[in-house]
């Protein structure tokens, strides 16, 4: 920040940055319309994940404890596809902004493949060492066993999550914020939450099987994401 302010000639965007917070109404309206679906998406997605966890909780406190351990470890590995998704948004967004649509499409395809490949490697590592992490917790053997199983399920699903996450950021880079809202949070409430509720409350399936089937709904998003990205609906000239 200090460097940017000391080198105003190289950072012309800082000129007049502190003169006021006024914004033309038309520009504000555009930002609000584009940004609102993203804000609502994060809100409803978080609420959906909380509801799914509540569905699991009807199977006992041991399940929640196991999930907490598994989620903590899984989130460390999930950083890979989360950050690669953000990279897709930046790189593809730059190409779209420059009007280089073919380069944007080529870069997007390569980065999606790279993301899935990296997460496949990370998933293999999770499967190999996932059982070690629960052992560092001072808890019961039942909870450790559940956590190990949940980690294994997350590892199996991770490459699919990488693809859907990449698809999400591809659509977002093209300004399709309403589509991403439908693709993410609406899908969570229409598909994931009902599946978790029915399986956890009205079936005799073990919690690991329930968790696997709920996580496997990601495959539906893979199909949807594939056709949406392939349709090039996101491939638009931004300026």
What are these regions (language model features)?
Residues 43, 47, 119-127, 162, ...:
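Hydrophobic positions within alpha-helical transmembrane segments of bacterial inner-membrane proteins
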Residues 2-3, 20-51, 76, 80, ...:
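Hydrophobic faces of transmembrane alpha-helices in multi-pass small-molecule transporters and flippases
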Residues 43-76, 94-95, 132-141, 201-202:
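Helix-terminus/linker motif at the lipid-water interface of multi-pass membrane proteins
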Residues 66-130, 161-180:
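Small-residue-rich hydrophobic transmembrane alpha-helices
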Residues 1-2, 82-85, 154-173, 179-191, ...:
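Short runs within selected transmembrane alpha-helices of multi-pass transporters and secretion channels
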């Amino acid at each position: 920040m200090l460097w940017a302010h000391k080198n105003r000639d190289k950072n012309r965007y800082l000129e007049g940055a502190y003169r006021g917070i006024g914004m033309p109404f038309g520009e504000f309206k555009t930002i609000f319309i584009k940004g609102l679906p993203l804000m609502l998406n994060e809100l409803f997605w978080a609420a959906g994940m909380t509801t799914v966890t509540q569905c699991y909780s009807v199977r006992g406190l041991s399940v929640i404890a196991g999930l907490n351990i598994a989620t903590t470890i899984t989130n460390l590995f999930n950083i890979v596809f989360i950050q690669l998704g953000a990279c897709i948004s930046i790189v593809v967004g730059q190409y779209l902004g420059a009007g280089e649509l073919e380069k944007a499409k080529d870069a997007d395809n390569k980065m999606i493949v790279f993301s899935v490949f990296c997460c496949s490697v990370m998933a293999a590592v999770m499967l190999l060492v996932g059982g070690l992490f629960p052992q560092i917790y001072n808890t019961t053997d039942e909870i450790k066993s559940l956590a190990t199983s949940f980690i294994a399920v997350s590892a199996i699903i991770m490459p699919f999550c990488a693809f859907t996450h990449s698809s999400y950021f591809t659509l977002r880079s093209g300004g399709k914020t309403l589509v991403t809202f439908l693709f993410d949070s609406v899908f969570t409430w229409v598909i994931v939450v009902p599946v978790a509720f029915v399986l956890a409350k009205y079936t005799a399936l073990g919690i690991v099987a329930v968790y696997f089937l709920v996580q496997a709904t990601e495959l539906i998003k893979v199909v949807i994401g594939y056709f949406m990205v392939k349709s090039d609906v996101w491939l638009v000239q931004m300026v």
